Structures are given as structure tokens and as C-alpha cells.
């Protein structure tokens, strides 16, 4: 069962640029909820509460419970506009989700056991994370906050592809249905040893220049 997080909201009475500007000056974020069989609803949220929430990974990848005076609607964050240089959220879009309809969402990847892997223990290997998130399709109840990628057995020269990620039950990666060329690398362990002869040659050149 996916975790949910409750956020209290209020209905927004006034709309337009002027009204939105006044809300922001009062520490309130203008927002909208759309999707499903209901009409779009203009809402407003406490800026301080959302500023703290958006610092957490779950805010972007989890089902959120919007509580409007006791009426709770399940939504996903679909867009968040920020001020270009101020610590200010300008506007938020939320999309309603239906318990019986699959949704598409970007889910973060958490890489574990890298340091203890054969590749991670080598000073001559660089482990690169080619992807930090993956687009999945699933029912709301199956949406994970993150997906773990276990690197414990990663060897020098190994590449882990998208198809090798262990997915939770009920979760699919639609990209993999588009063909083998879409089975991209997620992690690569590359050998980057510098030859001793090259290093010695560089030191000799530096010594000659200082004479």
C-alpha cells in the first residue's frame, strides 16, 4: 500500500493575476486541482507548509491527500512554478487520481550497497548513475515513493539496464515496451586506472621544466 501525505487547502475565491499576487504577498500559494470527472477547482495553500513539504522526495512522487474542509481528494503534483531567484513558489497544479485507473509518474531511484560492491571498493573504478528517476505506470495504490536499485554485486565493467531493475508488484516501465533500444543503462562501473608509466612520465616532464 502506497503511503499518502495530507495537505490542508482552502478554496480560492478570487482569480486572476492581481488576486494571485495578493495571495503570494500574504504567504499563500494559488493552485488548481483538475482531472477526473469533477470540474477544475481553484485552491490556495499555506506557503510555509508547502515550502517545507517540497524539500522532501515524497512531495513529487507520492499520492497526496488534499483536505478541503474535510473533503479529501487524492492527487499527484503535476507542476510547480518557482520564482527565478526568490525562495517563493508561484503556483501549483495538482491532478486528481482514480483508485481504479492507472497513472503515469516519475519515481526516484535509490541506489544501495554501492560502497560495499566489488566495483565500489576499487579506487580504479567510477560508478556512474545514468538515471536518477524512472517513469512508471501503475494503480495509485501501487505507486512507490522510490525504487531501490541494489548495487551490491556490481563488478568492474558491469552495466545495469532498465530491464534489470526489480519493480514492486503492479508497477511497469512503459519505456521497455517500445523496443530493445529503449532498455537504456541505469548504472555503469567504468575502469579509469591511470597507467603508472604515464604518471611517471608526467612527473619527469614537470621536473625538467623547473630546472
Swiss-Prot record:
InterPro entries: Rbsml_bL25/Gln-tRNA_synth_N, Ribosomal_bL25/Gln-tRNA_synth, Ribosomal_bL25_b-dom, Ribosomal_bL25_C, Ribosomal_bL25_long, Ribosomal_bL25_short, Ribosomal_L25_dom, Ribosomal_uL5_bac-type
Pfam families, per database record: Ribosomal_L25p, Ribosomal_TL5_C
Cellular component terms per the entry's GO annotation: cytosolic large ribosomal subunit
GO biological process: translation
Protein keywords: Ribonucleoprotein, Ribosomal protein, RNA-binding, rRNA-binding
Keyword rRNA-binding on entry: yes
Domain of life: Bacteria
Coiled-coil region(s): none
Disulfide bond positions: none
Alphabetical list of CDD domains matching this protein: Ribosomal_L25_TL5_CTC
One function term, GO molecular function aspect: structural constituent of ribosome
Subunit structure: Part of the 50S ribosomal subunit; part of the 5S rRNA/L5/L18/L25 subcomplex. Contacts the 5S rRNA. Binds to the 5S rRNA independently of L5 and L18.
Membership in a protein family: Belongs to the bacterial ribosomal protein bL25 family. CTC subfamily.
HAMAP family for this protein: Ribosomal_bL25 (MF_01336), Ribosomal_bL25_CTC (MF_01334)
Protein task: This is one of the proteins that binds to the 5S RNA in the ribosome where it forms part of the central protuberance.
The name this protein goes by in its record: Large ribosomal subunit protein bL25
Gene this protein is translated from: rplY
